[in-house]
C-alpha cells in the first residue's frame, strides 16, 4: 500500500508577531516547513499535499515542485485543514501521515518508525506521542487500564486530572487513508475553540472499536512545535547542536561548539579546525584542513583545502586551496581567489577574480578587477571603479607590481610584468614590461622650513 502525507501550513502564527507566515521562519538557515518536507521524504510518499492559507503564495514558493497544494481559506482547525485535501486523497488506499509545518526538529527516521509501527500493528490510526515533565499547552494522551490510547484531550478541554498526564500529543499522526476521510465527516465544533479537531477522529475510531495505537518518540526535542519566538530560539539551539555534532563525528574540530553557528546545508570536509564565534551560512563548502579563526563569517561560498581564514567575512565567493585571508578582510560577492593568494588585514575585494600567488597584504580595495597571477599590491592601493553612475573594470596582468598608495582609475589595463611607482594615479593603460609613474616630482626648498612658526629658530 502507498504512503501519503499532509503538511499543515495554513496558519498565520499570531504569537510570532510577524508578517511572515510562521512556517517560513528559518531555523539554521532554512524555513521550518522545508525541514518537515525533507523529513517526510523518508516515508517515500506517493502523494504529498500541503495545506496553505495565510500568504499562501510565499509558502508555495518554498515547496514548489515538492508537493501539491490546497487552500484553507478559513482557519477552522486541524480537522478542517485535513478536510481540504479530500479532492486529492479521498478514496485512495494507503497510510496517510498528517504533520504540522512548524515541527522542524522531527526526523525522517522517527517518521519512518511511526509508519512502520502503524503498519506492523495494523492500526487504523497511530498517534505520535512524547513524554515531558511540563506538558502545559499540549493535548494529553488518555489511555485505559490496558495502556491503549483512548482519546486526545486538548489543554483547554482537559479536566484537572487529565492535565496531570505527562504523555502528550505531538500533532503528528498516521491514519488509514480511506477511514480518515470517512471519519472526518462526523466531527463537529463542540469544543472550547469552536474548531474541527483532527484529534476527534481518534475518539470516533475508538467508539467503533477500531484499533488506535501510539508510538512514543525517544527524543522529546523532536516534538517541539514552534508557536513563538521563544520556541523558535529553542529549535535553533537544538538544531545547531545536531549540526555541530554531525560534523564533529565526521572529523571536524570545534574549539567551542556552543558558540559556533553552522547552517544545515553547509558542507565541511574532515580535519577542518573551527574556532569560536564562527558563522557558516547557506550553501557554504569548506575544504579539508582549512582553519577558520574566531569571528569568521562565511555565506554561500566555497573555500578550498588548507586555507586559513582569520576573523574575516566572505560572501558568495570562491576561495581556492591554500589561500590566506585576514584578519579583518572582506571578500564581497562574485569574487574568486586563486590558489595561494594572500588577502591581508583591512583589504576588501568585490566582484573580482584574482590569480594564483597574488598578494594584497594590507589596506587595499580591489573592485571589479581581473587580476593575474603573482601580482603584488602595495599598502594603500585603491582601484577606482565608480564614477558616480557606472562601474568600470580594471585588468591587471601577471607579475605586476603596484607600489604603495597607488590609485588605479578604471577602465584601465596594466600589462604583464609592469610596475606602478608608489603614490601614482594611473588613468591610462600601462604596456607590458613598462614602469608607470603618475605623480608630481619632488621639490626641495632649502631653508624654507625656518620660516615656519613651529621651527625651533622661531620659538
Swiss-Prot record:
InterPro entries from the UniProt entry: Bifunctional_GlmU, GlmU-like, GlmU_C_LbH, Hexapep, Hexapep_transf_CS, NTP_transferase_dom, Nucleotide-diphossugar_trans, Trimer_LpxA-like_sf
Region (Linker): 230-250
Pathway: Nucleotide-sugar biosynthesis; UDP-N-acetyl-alpha-D-glucosamine biosynthesis; N-acetyl-alpha-D-glucosamine 1-phosphate from alpha-D-glucosamine 6-phosphate (route II): step 2/2; Nucleotide-sugar biosynthesis; UDP-N-acetyl-alpha-D-glucosamine biosynthesis; UDP-N-acetyl-alpha-D-glucosamine from N-acetyl-alpha-D-glucosamine 1-phosphate: step 1/1; Bacterial outer membrane biogenesis; LPS lipid A biosynthesis
Biological-process GO terms, alphabetical: cell morphogenesis; cell wall organization; lipid A biosynthetic process; peptidoglycan biosynthetic process; regulation of cell shape; UDP-N-acetylglucosamine biosynthetic process
Keyword Acyltransferase part of the UniProt annotation: yes
Signal peptide: none
Pfam families, alphabetized: Hexapep_2, NTP_transferase
Oligomer and partners: Homotrimer.
Function per UniProt: Catalyzes the last two sequential reactions in the de novo biosynthetic pathway for UDP-N-acetylglucosamine (UDP-GlcNAc). The C-terminal domain catalyzes the transfer of acetyl group from acetyl coenzyme A to glucosamine-1-phosphate (GlcN-1-P) to produce N-acetylglucosamine-1-phosphate (GlcNAc-1-P), which is converted into UDP-GlcNAc by the transfer of uridine 5-monophosphate (from uridine 5-triphosphate), a reaction catalyzed by the N-terminal domain.
Name of the protein this chain belongs to: Bifunctional protein GlmU
Amino acid at each position: 500500500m502507498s504512503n501519503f502525507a499532509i503538511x499543515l501550513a495554513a496558519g498565520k502564527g499570531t504569537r510570532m508577531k510577524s508578517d511572515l507566515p510562521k512556517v517560513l521562519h528559518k531555523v539554521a538557515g532554512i524555513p521550518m516547513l522545508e525541514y518537515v518536507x525533507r523529513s517526510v521524504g523518508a516515508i517515500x510518499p506517493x502523494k504529498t499535499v500541503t495545506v496553505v492559507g495565510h500568504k499562501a503564495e510565499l509558502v508555495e514558493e518554498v515547496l514548489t515542485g515538492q508537493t501539491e497544494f490546497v487552500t484553507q481559506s478559513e482557519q477552522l482547525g486541524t480537522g478542517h485543514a485535513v478536510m481540504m485535501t479530500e479532492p486529492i486523497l479521498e478514496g485512495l488506499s494507503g497510510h496517510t501521515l498528517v504533520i504540522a509545518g512548524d515541527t522542524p526538529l522531527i526526523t525522517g527516521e522517527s517518521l519512518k518508525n511511526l509508519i512502520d509501527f502503524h503498519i506492523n500493528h495494523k492500526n487504523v490510526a497511530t498517534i505520535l506521542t512524547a513524554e515531558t515533565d511540563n506538558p502545559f499547552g499540549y493535548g494529553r494522551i488518555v489511555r485505559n487500564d490496558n495502556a491503549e490510547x483512548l482519546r486526545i484531550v486538548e489543554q483547554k478541554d482537559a479536566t484537572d486530572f487529565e492535565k496531570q498526564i505527562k504523555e502528550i500529543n505531538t500533532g503528528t499522526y498516521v491514519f488509514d487513508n480511506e477511514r480518515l476521510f470517512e471519519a472526518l465527516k462526523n466531527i463537529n465544533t463542540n469544543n472550547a475553540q469552536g474548531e474541527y479537531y483532527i484529534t476527534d477522529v481518534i475518539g470516533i475510531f475508538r467508539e467503533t472499536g477500531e484499533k488506535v495505537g501510539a508510538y512514543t518518540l525517544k527524543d522529546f526535542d523532536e516534538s517541539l512545535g514552534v508557536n513563538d519566538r521563544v520556541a523558535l530560539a529553542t529549535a535553533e539551539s537544538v538544531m545547531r547542536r545536531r549540526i555541530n555534532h554531525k560534523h564533529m563525528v565526521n572529523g571536524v574540530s570545534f574549539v567551542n561548539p556552543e558558540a559556533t553557528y553552522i547552517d544545515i546545508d553547509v558542507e565541511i570536509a574532515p580535519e577542518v579546525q573551527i574556532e569560536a564565534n564562527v558563522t557558516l551560512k547557506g550553501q557554504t563548502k569548506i575544504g579539508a584542513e582549512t582553519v577558520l579563526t574566531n569571528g569568521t563569517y562565511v555565506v554561500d561560498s566555497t573555500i578550498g583545502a588548507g586555507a586559513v581564514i582569520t576573523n574575516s567575512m566572505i560572501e558568495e565567493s570562491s576561495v581556492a586551496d591554500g589561500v590566506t585571508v585576514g584578519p579583518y578582510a572582506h571578500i564581497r560577492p562574485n569574487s574568486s581567489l586563486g590558489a595561494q593568494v594572500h588577502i591581508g588585514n583591512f583589504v576588501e575585494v568585490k566582484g573580482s577574480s584574482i590569480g594564483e600567488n597574488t598578494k594584497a597584504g594590507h589596506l587595499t580595495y580591489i573592485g571589479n578587477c581581473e587580476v593575474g597571477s603573482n601580482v603584488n599590491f602595495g599598502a594603500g592601493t585603491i582601484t577606482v571603479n565608480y564614477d558616480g553612475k557606472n562601474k568600470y573594470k580594471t585588468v591587471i596582468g601577471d607579475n605586476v607590481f603596484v607600489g604603495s598608495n597607488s590609485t588605479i582609475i578604471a577602465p584601465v589595463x596594466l600589462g604583464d610584468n609592469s610596475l606602478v611607482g608608489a603614490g601614482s594615479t594611473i588613468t591610462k593603460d600601462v604596456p607590458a614590461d613598462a614602469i608607470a609613474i603618475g605623480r608630481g616630482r619632488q621639490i626641495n626648498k632649502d631653508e624654507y622650513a625656518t620660516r615656519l612658526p613651529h621651527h625651533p629658530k622661531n620659538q
